[in-house]
Amino acid sequence: MNKRKLDIGKLISANVAWFVLLILVLFFGIFSENFFSFRNIMNLLSQNAYLLIASIGITFVMMSSGMDLSVGYVMSTMGVIGAKLLVDVGLPSAVVIVLMILITVAIELLNTWLSIKLRLQLLVVTIATMTIFQGATYIISESKTINNLPDSFKFWGQKYLFGSVPVSVILTLILFLVMSFVLNKTYFGRKVYALGGNPEAARLAGININKMRYSIAAIEGVFIGIDVVLLIGRLGSAVSTMGVGTEFTVMTGIFLGGVSMRGGEGKLSGVFAGILCIALLTNGMQLAGINIYYQYVVRGIILLAAIGYDVYQMTRRDNMKKRKLEEAREAKRA
């Protein structure tokens, strides 16, 4: 009986986000008549596709024990740059998409290069670059909304396939499946876990730490670039405030999904559930007419709770390791 309780406890502990998501789905399903309709589910996924895709890149960074706070303003900067290239310069959509992804990759590589060369945590570097991109966004956009994006660009955010499935949802699901495979089943994925779990042990095992950091930065850049394409494609316009705060919403979902603050732990499947939990809560608060400022308070409480739970889990694991070491030493003495 105790073993069964222990197994259930481990199952819940390892899949907190999925259990929370199940509770939320049941709750909203009971009180909302059309919640389980195919159309509503597709709308929920398409509206939050940009958060889900951003979470893939940010998860890789956090898995390797990094933290990037510049994501929101990188998104807004790339959004207005992409819109300017489309509307003012008149470049084809395909060219602009490639340029946006390449520039975003370059930005993330620059952040990582500064972190390595200045021997600073990525968190500290991105606090500085976040401010730079904040100013750059307002300068480039002149604090104006850029409209009239071509239909070929809006395809990624607004169009449907098979009659009723948004392109953004299909793309999101494919990317999650592919990157989950990369993280869980490939040598590169194992190196990401090793880098976050114990960088010194990873170095002694022959892993090139700096090369891995650059690779992870490039992955984040690709997904943030794709993310911006979907976001402005869905909105049909770009504004200097778009994307701001995305990193905190995504990090809340990532922590809730089981990714540890110190890296080396977690799965993208849990992150997927964590982001959907935040999306459902936000949607529910909006439907209930809760003031946006109260929504910020709730999100902050959830983020704090998710971090607190992560710290509790880390402390418990550390204590268990210490206990096992002590038991092993006592066994040797005996």
Please state what every model-predicted region is.
Residues A17-G29, I58, I101, M130, ...:
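Hydrophobic core segments of alpha-helical transmembrane domains in multi-pass membrane transport
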Residues I23-V89, L114-L120, I254-E265, I301:
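Single transmembrane alpha-helix segments in multi-pass membrane proteins
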Residues E33-N43, I140, L183, G189, ...:
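Inter-helical junctions in multi-pass inner-membrane proteins, predominant
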Residues L91-V98, I107-N111, L161-A238:
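Helix-loop-helix "hairpin" substructures at the membrane interface of multi-pass membrane proteins
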Residues L118, L122-K185, M212-S215, R234-G243, ...:
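Transmembrane helix-bundle core of multi-pass membrane transporters
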Residues I224, R234-V297:
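Transmembrane alpha-helical segments in multi-pass inner-membrane proteins
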